[in-house]
């Protein structure tokens, strides 16, 4: 049985970040900085409450007679209580013989063009551990992008304004960055398991390292750019945030309304139409929060019964990173032209160059991951390098055709076909392991 390392990581980040936020808020109170104290507590306690409710919702404890679990969650100690449950189940799993098991079927990665279907017995203890891992992973994503991301931005902004960094602030910024990167990593794993739910997915350690570096560079540079821009144009940053937020929040709904599909009713049997609407709104809220700081890897599709698109859209990925790079460049240029005296001893051109190179480095690690370390790269219809070469050929062909004054309608169609690749395997449907796969509702069960 797999050791629950992801549970330990989630609980450690949750407890450490909450404790650091409480300590830092007390120092702000002692210094008389009431506003910083309130915001620090808000970005700590709000995701903390959402995490408690997420764990309760996933395990359906609200409809069960478990007063101790409810009490621990009310005391904001739910993750610690759940962690103890996980280790009790893990330690007792080898001692007790499983009276009941379920059988799941998965396909192995193709070897020499052949893919075998294997059966696996899953006992009750292992099924409970899978549920706990999924619950903590969902909670980590919520904590990362609804708590840690604004917390990191706030503390870095305070550091820039005061031109001073304390030990407590440095500690919480480090924890917040780790929490965001870990949440983004969980999003990547979620996307892989959803798109290839027929297959037995095994992520290698080098793949985790590559994703960690990709997300670290991407998120760190994004937060620094937002903080620099906020420090000189406080009013305009509201417009930037609102445009980013509502673009990603409304996009899934606009696509849904344009499709003319009926309202999804099969998300959760216990939910009414109002409850389903609330869950979908929270899902799109979390989706917008993720995409404001990094690529979500999971694409919402409300008109889909599973609420998540299983196709790998390279075209959308390309558009996202090109747009985000242009946006970061524009924000840095505006900061350069309107910077104040607090940046007197900062070499602005060098800082801008470092941030843009850092963001490009993150994109480079992303390409390396998809080219060499993706666990399902054998199922891709084309690799990253092949898609890039096809894009260059289409671009050159388009340029030549324009020079010859010929119609470009077919060229645009070919260009889109070269950049948008559907990598889903065309295999027969098998029985997926239900408890091991996240759905869109699983991601936002709060």
Curated annotation (Swiss-Prot):
Pfam families: XK-related. The keyword Isomerase does not apply. Keywords: Amino-acid transport, Disulfide bond, Endoplasmic reticulum, Membrane, Phosphoprotein, Transmembrane, Transmembrane helix, Transport. Residues 24-37, 90-140, 193-208, 257-277, 339-349 are extracellular. The modification Phosphoserine is found at residue 115. GO terms for cellular component: endoplasmic reticulum membrane; plasma membrane. One of its GO terms (molecular function) is protein-macromolecule adaptor activity. Coiled coil: none annotated. It is a multi-pass membrane protein. Heterodimer with Kell; disulfide-linked. Interacts with VPS13A. Belongs to the XK family. PANTHER family: ENDOPLASMIC RETICULUM MEMBRANE ADAPTER PROTEIN XK, MEMBRANE TRANSPORT PROTEIN XK FAMILY MEMBER. Recruits the lipid transfer protein VPS13A from lipid droplets to the endoplasmic reticulum (ER) membrane. This is Endoplasmic reticulum membrane adapter protein XK. The lineage of its organism: Eukaryota, Metazoa, Chordata, Craniata, Vertebrata. The gene is Xk.
């Amino acid at each position: 049985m797999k050791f629950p390392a992801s549970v330990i990581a989630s609980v450690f980040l949750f407890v450490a970040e909450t404790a650091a936020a409480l300590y830092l808020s007390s120092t702000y109170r002692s210094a008389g900085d009431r506003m910083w104290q309130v915001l620090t507590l808000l970005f700590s306690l709000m995701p903390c409450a959402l995490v408690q409710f997420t764990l309760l919702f996933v395990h359906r404890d609200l409809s069960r007679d478990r007063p101790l679990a409810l009490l621990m969650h009310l005391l904001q100690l739910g993750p610690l209580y759940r962690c103890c449950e996980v280790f009790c189940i893990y330690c007792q799993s080898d001692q007790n013989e499983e009276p009941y098991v379920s059988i799941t079927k998965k396909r192995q990665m193709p070897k020499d063009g052949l893919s075998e279907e294997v059966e696996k017995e899953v006992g009750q203890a292992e099924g409970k551990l899978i549920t706990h891992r999924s619950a903590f992973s969902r909670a980590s994503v919520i904590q990362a992008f609804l708590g840690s991301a604004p917390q990191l931005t706030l503390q870095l902004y305070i550091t820039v304004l005061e031109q001073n960094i304390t030990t407590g602030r440095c500690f919480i910024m480090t924890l917040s960055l780790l929490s965001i990167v870990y949440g983004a990593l969980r999003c990547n794993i979620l996307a892989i398991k959803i798109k290839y739910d027929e297959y037995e997915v095994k992520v290698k350690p080098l793949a985790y390292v590559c994703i960690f570096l990709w997300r670290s560079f991407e998120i760190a540079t994004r937060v620094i750019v937002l903080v620099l821009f906020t420090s000189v144009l406080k009013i305009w940053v509201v417009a930037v945030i609102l445009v980013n937020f509502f673009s990603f929040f409304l996009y899934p709904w606009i696509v849904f309304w344009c499709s003319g599909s009926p309202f999804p009713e099969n998300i959760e049997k216990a939910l009414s139409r109002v409850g389903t609407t609330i869950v979908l709104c929270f899902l799109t809220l979390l989706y917008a929060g993720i995409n404001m700081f990094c690529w979500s890897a999971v694409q919402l599709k409300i008109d889909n019964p599973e609420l998540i698109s299983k196709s790998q859209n390279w075209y959308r990925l390309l558009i996202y990173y090109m747009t985000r790079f242009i946006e970061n460049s524009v924000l840095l240029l505006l900061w350069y032209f309107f910077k104040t005296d607090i940046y007197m001893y900062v070499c602005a051109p060098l800082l801008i160059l470092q941030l843009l190179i850092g963001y490009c480095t993150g994109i480079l690690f992303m390409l390396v991951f998809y080219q060499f370390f993706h666990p399902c790269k054998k199922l891709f219809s084309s690799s990253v390098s092949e898609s890039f070469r096809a894009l260059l050929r289409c671009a050159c062909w388009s340029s030549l055709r324009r020079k010859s004054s010929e119609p470009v309608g077919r060229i645009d169609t070919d260009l889109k076909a070269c950049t948008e690749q559907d990598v889903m395997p065309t295999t027969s449907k098998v029985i997926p392991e239900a408890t091991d796969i996240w759905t869109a509702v699983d991601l936002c069960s709060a």
